[in-house]
């Protein structure tokens, strides 16, 4: 984003009940089931959801205790937790078809460590990390507030309150912010479309949604009343997988930085941490966030690249966007590689990724989340190397 002048920037989010997010949730549910049984299981699970039908497909390598029957039960529990018990999509009677097979031996031989050969990357690719000072979470403000609006609406829906009972699981948000010299100063428009029951009126929904927006946005940031769009097309009763088919991995911009930073193209959900699409994107965020937390720069974009079967990154690139505080970017790249082993194994061990921690990542963004110390999740959001970075640059 530009550092000078005035401009508008927009990001969107979708709720856990959006069809694509239902698919992401189920794929990560399968992943967590395998990692719970075997921390070194291999999983690449894709999910399709549509009217009363769920299809799982992909490749796995793990213990026989993870049976199709177990995965079907976990799939139904995930759908129930999201809140779907509707005629067109219900946890009780949706058809669940499971088509998972063994991981390709050709892929496994490139990834597995043998003898003196360290574990290789599960595929080639480029991954990006980003951090900035726009929010306390060091995330871009438009995506941060888009997520928060939907998270609050979901909390309300699941609260059992009178207002919450009017809401159904499928929802989307979109926040447009005005920037002055690279800093957000207020919202110019907010769009929220939320699925609802037949009994809900548009006036009631508007009151509920506007109240949540007011709770989420900073003081003085509310857009004009006429620029708050709630269910702009009117009725939104039929939603979720009954309204639109959903697929794993179709919300990669929602999952990351809302378009404020580049994206390498790889999705996250359903992939075990040997897949650098996921693990390297996590460590890239971790490194970028620690640079900003160390006050070495106000905005950081970081790129890492890998080749399948190769244990070290082919490149590490850091861009401080002119916001560095007397920091040499080449030295910073070298320092980051010294502080964190960026091999696939090194990333997994540093961030403790071989655990069943992925279901919570499947909605409301993989980044900008608050780590739960009891669960030891979202470890890539910790800023535990910021002090070492400051020391390396004599701060």
Curated annotation (Swiss-Prot):
Q: Does the keyword Transcription apply?
A: no
Ligand binding (K(+)): 46
Which residue stretches belong to region Flexible loop? 103-113
Please, one GO biological process term? S-adenosylmethionine biosynthetic process
Q: Which Pfam families does this UniProt record tie to the protein?
A: S-AdoMet_synt_C, S-AdoMet_synt_M, S-AdoMet_synt_N
**What does the entry comment about cofactor binding?**
Binds 2 divalent ions per subunit. Binds 1 potassium ion per subunit.
Which cofactors go with this protein? Mg(2+); K(+)
Q: Name one GO molecular function term.
A: magnesium ion binding
Binding positions for ATP per the UniProt entry: 18, 170-172, 235-236, 244, 250-251, 267, 271
Disulfide bond entries:
none
From the UniProt record, give the pathway where this protein acts: Amino-acid biosynthesis; S-adenosyl-L-methionine biosynthesis; S-adenosyl-L-methionine from L-methionine: step 1/1
Q: Tell me where in or outside the cell this protein is found.
A: Cytoplasm
Give the EC number.
Answer: 2.5.1.6
| Enzyme class, broadest EC rank | transferase
Q: Which residues bind Mg(2+)?
A: 20
Instruction: Choose one Gene Ontology CC annotation of this protein and give it.
Output: cytoplasm
Q: Which PROSITE patterns match?
A: ADOMET_SYNTHASE_1, ADOMET_SYNTHASE_2
Summary of subunit composition and partner proteins: Homotetramer; dimer of dimers.
Q: Which family does it belong to?
A: Belongs to the AdoMet synthase family.
The protein in question is named S-adenosylmethionine synthase
**Organism listed in the record:** Granulibacter bethesdensis (strain ATCC BAA-1260 / CGDNIH1)
């Amino acid at each position: 984003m530009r550092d000078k002048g005035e401009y508008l920037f927009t990001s969107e989010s979708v709720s856990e009940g959006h069809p694509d997010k239902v698919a992401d949730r189920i794929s990560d549910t399968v992943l967590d089931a395998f990692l719970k049984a075997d921390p070194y299981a291999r999983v690449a699970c894709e999910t399709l959801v549509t009217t009363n039908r769920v299809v799982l497909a992909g490749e796995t390598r793990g213990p026989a205790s993870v049976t199709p029957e177990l995965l079907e039960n976990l799939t139904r529990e995930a759908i129930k937790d999201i809140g779907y018990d509707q005629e067109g999509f219900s946890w009780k009677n949706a058809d669940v078809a499971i088509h998972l097979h063994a991981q390709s031996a050709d892929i496994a031989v490139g990834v597995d460590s043998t003898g003196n050969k360290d574990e290789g990357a599960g595929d080639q690719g480029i991954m990006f990390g980003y951090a900035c000072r726009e929010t306390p979470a060091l995330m871009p403000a438009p995506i941060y507030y888009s997520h928060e609006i939907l998270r609050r609406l979901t909390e309300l829906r699941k609260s059992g309150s009178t207002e919450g009972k009017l809401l159904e699981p499928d929802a989307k948000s979109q926040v447009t912010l005005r920037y002055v010299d690279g800093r957000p100063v207020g919202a110019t428009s907010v769009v929220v479309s939320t699925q609802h029951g037949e009994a809900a009126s548009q006036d009631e929904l508007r009151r509920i949604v506007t109240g949540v927006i007011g709770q989420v946005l900073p003081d003085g940031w509310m857009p004009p009343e006429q620029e708050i769009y709630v269910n702009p097309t009117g009725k939104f009763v039929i939603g979720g997988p009954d309204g639109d088919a959903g697929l794993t991995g179709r919300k990669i911009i929602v999952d990351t930085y809302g378009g404020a930073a580049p994206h390498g193209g790889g999705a996250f959900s359903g992939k075990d941490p040997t897949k650098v699409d996921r693990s390297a994107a996590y460590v890239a965020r971790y490194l970028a966030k620690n640079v900003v937390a160390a006050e070495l720069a106000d905005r950081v974009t970081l790129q890492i690249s890998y080749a399948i079967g190769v244990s070290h990154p082919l490149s590490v690139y850091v861009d401080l966007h002119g916001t560095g505080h007397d920091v040499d970017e080449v030295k910073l790249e070298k320092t980051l590689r010294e502080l964190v082993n960026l091999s696939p194994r090194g990333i997994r061990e540093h961030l403790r990724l071989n655990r069943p921690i992925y279901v919570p990542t499947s909605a409301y963004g993989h980044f900008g989340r608050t780590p739960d110390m009891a669960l030891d999740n979202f470890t890539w959001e910790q800023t535990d190397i910021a002090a070492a970075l400051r020391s390396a640059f004599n701060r």
